[in-house]
Amino acid sequence: MDCRKMVRFSYSVIWIMAISKAFELGLVAGLGHQEFARPSRGDLAFRDDSIWPQEEPAIRPRSSQRVLPMGIQHSKELNRTCCLNGGTCMLESFCACPPSFYGRNCEHDVRKENCGSVPHDTWLPKKCSLCKCWHGQLRCFPQAFLPGCDGLVMDEHLVASRTPELPPSARTTTFMLAGICLSIQSYY
């Protein structure tokens, strides 16, 4: 493979990953008003609208000027009923989750979201497709432009836990991504 083809291939892979992230963020945006879908491990997850009391003033500072109250109670007095999986309820609004758990109420377990031996949010190249483990499902995108694929997408049966067949909407997205990649390749 000459240098030009390698550069085109690299750009195509970068575009696929960027478009995939955009679709993921689009799915995340549908979860709720300014709610973080998955904070990084150790971070605190909270909804933006839950940190203000019901009797908030008519004039609110811009979100960049908000300061969380510092009066967190002693651990013996904390209300732990709002959190699952050993999380600590803070200000009766959000949870500080233990490692491997996340979500508003520590309801999601990272350990259950892997695809067999493939960790969550990991890309896995397979013959003529590029797969990603996302919340326990291995989702594959055809890569018909790869050398040796000759425009054909090979039907691969990948072994992973909890990996159902893609729904029709995901297939449409996959073909749309493949079309975008092919148009990018033909442009160069």
Swiss-Prot record:
Keyword Transit peptide in record: no
Glycosylation sites: 79
One GO term (biological process): heart development
Alphabetically ordered keywords of this record: Cell membrane, Disulfide bond, EGF-like domain, Glycoprotein, Growth factor, Membrane
SUPFAM superfamilies cross-referenced by the UniProt entry: EGF/Laminin
Principal subcellular localisation of the protein: membrane
Pfam families according to UniProt: CFC
GO molecular-function term, one example from the UniProt record: growth factor activity
Annotated S-S bridges: 82-89, 83-95, 97-106, 115-133, 128-149, 131-140
Gene Ontology, cellular component aspect: cell surface; extracellular region; plasma membrane
Alphabetized InterPro entries for the sequence: Cripto_growth_factor (IPR017047), Cryptic/Cripto_CFC-dom (IPR019011), EGF-like_dom (IPR000742)
Location in or out of the cell: Cell membrane
Descriptive protein name: Protein CRIPTO3
Domain EGF-like: start-end pairs: 78-107
UniProt key word Nucleotidyltransferase: no
Function according to Swiss-Prot or TrEMBL: Could play a role in the determination of the epiblastic cells that subsequently give rise to the mesoderm. Activates the Nodal-dependent signaling pathway.
